[in-house]
Amino acid sequence: MTGRAFLTGATGFVGSHVARALCNAGWRVKALVRRSGNPRQLGIGDLPVEIVPGDLSAHTDLADAVSGSDAIVHVAGLVRARTLDDYREGNVLATVRLLRAAHQRAPDALVVLVSSQAAAGPARDGRQVCEGDVARPVSGYGLSKREGEEAVEREWKGP
C-alpha cells in the first residue's frame, strides 16, 4: 500500500526514521512541524516531505493538514512535563484532536499510533509484557500514553 501519509513527530528521533521509511516505500509524506521547528536541522531536511507548519493544539491546523490522507501516523508525544495534566494535553487530548480532524477530512485513512512501553508498565515476574496484559503504567508519562491508546480505541471508527 502506498499513497498519501500524514505524519506527526517527524522531526523527532523515531519520527524522522518513520518519515524516511515511508518515503523509501513510495509514500507521499506530509509532516506536521511546529512553527518553531527547522526540518533541515531535525533529520528530515533531505527527504521529499511536504512540511505543514502547525501543531497538535489547533484543530483547524489538523483538519486542513490531514485532508485526503490515506494513512495517518501519529508519532508525536510529550516526553517531559511538569504535571499529569500537561502529559494528558500532549499525549491524550492532542491525539483526540487529531482523530476528530481525521474523522472530518480523512475518514477512510489507516491510523497508526506509536506509543511507548511505558504505557504497559514494567514486566512482572520476569516475563515479557504482552498486548493482552493489564496495563500498569508507573509514571505520568506512561499513564498518559496508555490513555492515548485508549482514546484511539474509543474514538477511531475508521475503515
State each model region's role.
Residues 138-159:
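Active-site Tyr-X1-5-Lys
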Residues 38-49:
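Short, conserved SAM-binding/catalytic segment
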Residues 8, 32, 72-76, 111-117:
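SDR active-site strand-loop-helix element
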Residues 79, 96-140:
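Conserved Rossmann-fold NAD(P)-dependent oxidoreductase catalytic core, especially the SDR/UDP-sugar
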Residues 32-37, 55-56:
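N-terminal Rossmann-fold cofactor-binding loop
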Residues 3-27:
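N-terminal Rossmann NAD(P)H-binding glycine-rich loop of SDR-like oxidoreductase domains
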Residues 89-96, 132, 143, 147:
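Conserved internal alpha-helix in NAD(P)-dependent oxidoreductase domains
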Residues 53-93, 101, 119-120:
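NAD(P)H-binding glycine-rich loop region in Rossmannoid oxidoreductase-like domains
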